Every structure is written in C-alpha cells, then in structure tokens.
Amino acid sequence: MIIFNNLSITMKKRKISTYQLREKTGIDSKTIRRLKANENIETKTLNKLCTALNCKLEDIAEYVQD
C-alpha cells in the first residue's frame, strides 16, 4: 500500500499551504483529499507534486505492506 503521510511533512518543511500547492500544480481539491485519504492517484499527479515541491518521490510517498 502506498501512503502519502510524508506529503504533509514535506509541505511544512517548504512552508507551502494546501492552497499554494493547488495553485502551483493545478491539482484540484478532490485529488488533494484523495492524497490525504491515501487513495490511488495518477503518476502524473505525483510528478506535479515532486516538481512543485522540488523533492523526490520518497519525500511525499511511502510503501508499507498491508
């Protein structure tokens, strides 16, 4: 299972709010809610997040066994 708990941590480190992230990436509110609920998202969304936050995938996502 992929979880996105690290996303909030990375956002805090970079002092970026959810609103700013949405504006910077064009990701809608529904997708942000899906991220916070650890639901499936498209890889292009992950790419947008990593680009906007200037980070690696492991800075926003983590694999944990079910």
Identify the residue ranges that each predicted region occupies.
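A short, Lys/Arg-rich alpha-helix, primarily the initiator
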Residues: 1-20
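Short, charged recognition helix plus adjacent turn
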Residues: 9-10, 35, 61-66
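Alpha-helical residues within the helix-turn-helix
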Residues: 12, 23, 51
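Residues in the helix-turn-helix
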Residues: 20, 31, 59
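Recognition helix of helix-turn-helix/homeodomain-like DNA-binding domains
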Residues: 27-40
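Hydrophobic micro-packing sites on short alpha-helices
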Residues: 48-50, 60-61
